[in-house]
Amino acid sequence: MAPPPNTYSESWWGGKEERGTPVVVKMDNPYSLVEIDGPGMAAPSEKARGKNAKQLTWVLLLRAHRAVGCVAWLAAGFWAVLGAVNRRVRRSRDADAEPDAEASGRGRAMLRFLRGFLLLSLAMLAFETVAHLKGWHFPRSAAGLPEKYLRRLPEHLQHLPEHLRRHLPEHLRMPEKEEIEGWLHRAYVAWLAFRIDYIAWAIQKLSGFCIALFMVQSVDRLVLCLGCFWIKLRGIKPVADTSISNDDIEATAGDGGGYFPMVLIQMPMCNEKEVYETSISHVCQIDWPRERMLVQVLDDSDDETCQMLIKAEVTKWSQRGVNIIYRHRLNRTGYKAGNLKSAMSCDYVRDYEFVAIFDADFQPNPDFLKLTVPHFKGNPELGLVQARWSFVNKDENLLTRLQNINLCFHFEVEQQVNGVYLSFFGFNGTAGVWRIKALEDSGGWMERTTVEDMDIAVRAHLNGWKFIFLNDVKVLCELPESYQAYRKQQHRWHSGPMQLFRLCLPAVFKSKISTWKKANLVMLFFLLRKLILPFYSFTLFCVILPLTMFVPEAELPIWVICYVPVIMSVLNILPAPKSFPFVIPYLLFENTMSVTKFNAMVSGLFQLGSSYEWVVTKKAGRTSSESDILALAEAADADARPPPAKLHRGVSEGGLKEWAKLHKEQEDATAAAAAAAAPGTPVKKSKAAKAPNRIFKKELALAFLLLTAATRSLLSAQGLHFYFLLFQGVTFLAVGLDLIGEQVS
């Protein structure tokens, strides 16, 4: 029998009920429908009306306050942008004092071309606007004329081929002689005839060629994505040999047995004061027998303060028992390749079997060598094991987010697919382990290009060495946070391959590798992905598309402008699914970067001076959250050892004294120079400041060109073309004003 209901608990709303006892509330009439103006509807009182009116007033006031706040926020943001633009325009001359390909004579040709193109487009826009206002685009009584008359072509256009006649606008009708009014109208008619006879077909032919290249490159990208999908589906990945032989036990008897070959770690750096300490700290904490590992810090810095700091950091870790040495070249030639070549010439290098390379901003995990070196065991043809990059500042700003999309696709798709199916890919220059014999058989590091990593990879591939890419082994590093640093990095990355292509092409045909590998190296690795991609991207979207707005007889299909690029951008963003909201900004930004990549490709192909320039990418010195864990492990390890010499901020006591002395000398020299220049003026201590934001003239010229073309598209009522040109022009404008990356106030 059920217990009687607890009326007390029901009336008290569960306040005094027993813990865990549910409260059941029964409603006699759960669905009570009251008819409006019916007998059950009570008349609203004046008090309720006043209350509702007050509530409505407060809601409206709250929404009005939010609207005003939104408008004020937009106005403040717009004013801040205008202020930043004004400051950058005023500082542009000072910023241009830094060496740059754009400011030199060899870089002015493209800027002059873009300026001339812009001036011509503005003149054509003014001309077309006058013609549109006067109705010269249409017959005077177009509404009352039959359709067949509107489609009629003049006699001198009957000879046009069918594919050009098909692209002629339906409203085009050349006026008769008696309809021409004045010299301006006559000039416009002559311009119409000239662009149809001589310009339209040339633009149409060039656009067809670029569309064909675009489709070939799209198919290549689709095949790479399918290959990556198949690798994920089947779980294909390199497997290391973890077995332990008797030779391994004898060679590492003091380390408990295992496969621990002699490994040399090289850390090339140059004036990278922001990141040297973190990088050296991570490398020195790699889990490997210390007597079987040597760390070379290859310092090419010309800043004496930076040299002293790096030397002091090396001294600190040497006192802690790490086998580490500091090297500084007196003859600093050949950039990074010359630095590595000089380090490999040391006599003690012959005692080592493998060499791992880390740039100054890389932070390897302690198990890096244990995850990479075992792949060499039992695989004598393996020359390189490459790890994937991971980025500590990928969410810092919009620029780093877009870079993360690009590089995630590069590692997840390009490197992994080429490594699995071809056993060849371009060495990324860092976070990789080389077999020293492979380097020596391939001629070692060469200084002939600025992409020494790709150079050694191609030569090793021609000698028959195989590569492995480990997608699950990641090494933290930094992305450039400013557009200026990213632009210089991309210029070097795209000019060097074209320079290398010219140099190694004879060696490719003379090599003994298979014909298929030769074709892949020439057609896909160099031509399609290094030359064709920047060529068609710049030509199609930055030159031909604006031209078709002023020459409407030649047009680009909508699927070329919109649909296929969006699909390709979605494929690019799949390895980084969290970045999917940035698919449209990524597409627009990649088109913007085509200017820099095209310019770099041309300079490398024709061996212009800018292809030999090497600029060290600026670093911010950011670290990961894993640094805290490593610091705790370091502290625990330090407790088990006798206390070393007193350290301060990661430098030894002797190194700190030397640095302090040098720093004081520099301060005294600065104070003396300031006093001599302006006697009686107090001297302010200056901090190391970042380079200010600047304006980029090529991007600005293209921004105004695309916006002019967008305005012209309104006269032809081309809606989708207008929106694409508008957004692309605004993107060029934001990049040209350096509003996309790090903002230095």
Swiss-Prot record:
Record-annotated membrane-spanning stretches: 116-136, 196-216, 531-551, 556-576, 695-715, 720-740
Active site: 300, 453
Topological relation to the membrane, as annotated: Multi-pass membrane protein
EC number of the protein: 2.4.1.-
Family matches, as Gene3D superfamilies: Spore Coat Polysaccharide Biosynthesis Protein SpsA, Chain A
Annotated Gene Ontology cellular component terms: Golgi apparatus; Golgi membrane
UniProt keywords, alphabetically: Cell wall biogenesis/degradation, Glycosyltransferase, Golgi apparatus, Membrane, Transferase, Transmembrane, Transmembrane helix
One BP annotation, GO: cell wall organization
Binding annotation for substrate: 359, 361
Localization annotation: Golgi apparatus membrane
Chief location: Golgi
InterPro entries tied to this protein: Glyco_trans_2-like, Nucleotide-diphossugar_trans
Any GO MF annotation of the entry: glycosyltransferase activity
EC class (word): transferase
UniProt xrefs under Pfam families: Glyco_trans_2_3
Family under the similarity heading: Belongs to the glycosyltransferase 2 family. Plant cellulose synthase-like C subfamily.
Function, as annotated: Probable beta-1,4-glucan synthase rather involved in the synthesis of the xyloglucan backbone than cellulose. Seems to work simultaneously with xyloglucan 6-xylosyltransferase. Xyloglucan is a noncellulosic polysaccharides of plant cell wall and consists of a glucan backbone substituted by xylose, galactose and fucose.
Protein name (database record): Probable xyloglucan glycosyltransferase 3
Organism lineage string: Eukaryota, Viridiplantae, Streptophyta, Embryophyta, Tracheophyta
